[in-house]
Every structure is written in structure tokens, then in C-alpha cells.
UniProtKB/Swiss-Prot annotation:
It is found in: Secreted; Target cell membrane. One of its GO terms (cellular component) is other organism cell membrane. Belongs to the non-disulfide-bridged peptide (NDBP) superfamily. Short antimicrobial peptide (group 4) family. The keyword Cytoplasm does not apply. A fragment comprising residues 4-17 has been detected in venom but it is unclear whether it has a physiological role or is simply due to degradation. This is Imcroporin. Keywords: Amidation, Antibiotic, Antimicrobial, Cleavage on pair of basic residues, Membrane, Secreted, Signal, Target cell membrane, Target membrane. Residues 1-22 form the signal peptide. The modification Lysine amide is found at residue 39. Has potent antibacterial activity against Gram-positive bacteria M.luteus, B.thuringiensis, S.aureus and B.subtilis, but not Gram-negative bacteria. Shows a weak cytotoxicity effect against mammalian cell lines and relatively low hemolytic activity against human erythrocytes.
Amino acid sequence: MKFQYLLAVFLIVLVVTDHCQAFFSLLPSLIGGLVSAIKGRRRRQLEARFEPKQRNFRKRELDFEKLFANMPDY
């Protein structure tokens, strides 16, 4: 009978520690998000993440269309 209680307590402790670990690992990202929200920082725009030579997406798209138009169909 004591073994069943010991097993139940062990499983409860295991579940509680798992939830605590998940909660405490979430805290740093929450704190960072709150700090950036308070300071008013905005996320960078998508275009700022690309190198300057890659900014002209439409021109590259037209170049690919021209390239594929000249390729033979198999």
C-alpha cells in the first residue's frame, strides 16, 4: 500500500516540477517583451533584414520569368 502512495507522490512531484520548469523558462522572454514594450521599440521592417543588393525583389522576379521563358519545355 505504501508503494502506491509513494508512486502517486512521485508522479505528482514530477508533473509539478515539469510545469514549474516550463513557467520559469518562459519568464525571461516575458520580461524581455515587457521591457521592449515599455521602451516603445518597434520590430524592424522586413525589408531592413535583407541586404541592400536583395531589395529589388520585383526585378529579380522579372529576370527569372525571362530566364524560364527562354528555357525549353521537356
